[in-house]
Design a protein with these regions (language model features):
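The feature captures the beta-strand-to-loop junction immediately N-terminal to the Walker
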Residues: 43-44
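Conserved ABC transporter NBD signature motif
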Residues: 66-78
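Catalytic Walker B motif of ABC-type/P-loop ATPase nucleotide-binding domains
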Residues: 179-182
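Helical segment within the ABC ATPase nucleotide-binding domain
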Residues: 194-208
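Conserved ABC ATPase signature
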Residues: 153-158, 162
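A short, proline-enriched helix->beta-strand linker immediately N-terminal to the Walker B motif
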Residues: 173-177
């Protein structure tokens, strides 16, 4: 695959972590290409810089970090030098992020399906009725039980594995080109991990979405 074929192209990326007194190299000379439909696994111990690299693939850095060298290109767009407005326009619509803790990512005061509908409504991609219909279809594709009604529950009313799949459905709501999965199964038991991983793999293949899967667990 050439760089021209890639949806995401990272070249010689260098990121430093900064404090008042020190500067530490966190990401050193990393290059990779990712095309639509591919899943790239980032594996390493805690503190190895996996999540930092995942954020950089979206054009973002953690607080206290700085991109000091290299390039990150998404579908021809230079994310390192992109304006905040350009990044905001891409995030949620063409680039999505699935965090480690689904429980912390959902608002406990709102029903799951209402939160699912926010992104397509914000980006003007669908009406509320269409967004809810699509949510139910995604719940079904992700093998959530009772897909017609589970979205009308509050986050605390479903299991951890179900909530993690609901968050994956929410990330897919705008049919993004790229999804970053940042250790989405860490808090789940082994059986539930397998269910979530199978569901993620299937839906990524169905929509030919590029994905970066971050984990510290080699078995995953």
């Amino acid at each position: 695959m050439t760089t021209r074929d890639a949806l995401v192209s990272i070249r010689n990326l260098e990121i430093d972590g900064l404090t008042e007194e020190t500067r530490v190299r966190i990401i050193n000379d990393v290059s990779l290409d990712l095309k639509r439909g591919e899943v790239l696994g980032l594996i390493g111990e805690s503190g190895a810089g996996k999540s930092t690299l995942g954020l950089a693939a979206m054009g973002f850095t953690r607080d206290g970090c700085e991109i000091v060298g290299g390039s990150v290109t998404f579908d021809g767009i230079d994310l390192v030098n992109a304006t905040p407005e350009t990044r905001r326009r891409l995030l949620g619509k063409r680039i999505a992020y699935v965090a480690q803790s689904a429980a912390a990512s959902f608002n406990p005061a709102h029903k799951i399906i209402n939160q699912h509908a926010e992104a397509p409504l914000f980006h003007g991609l669908s009406s509320r009725n269409d967004a809810e219909t699509d949510a139910i279809d995604l719940y079904r594709r992700l093998r959530l039980p009772n897909p017609d009604e589970i979205g009308f529950r509050y986050p605390h009313q479903v299991s951890g594995g179900q909530l993690q799949r609901a968050m994956t459905a929410m990330a897919m709501s705008c049919r993004p080109d790229l999804i970053i999965f940042d250790e989405p199964t860490t808090a789940l038991d082994v059986t539930t991990q397998i269910e979530v991983l199978v569901a993620i793999r299937e839906i990524v293949e169905q929509f030919q979405t590029a994905a970066i899967y971050i984990t510290h667990d080699l078995a995953v």
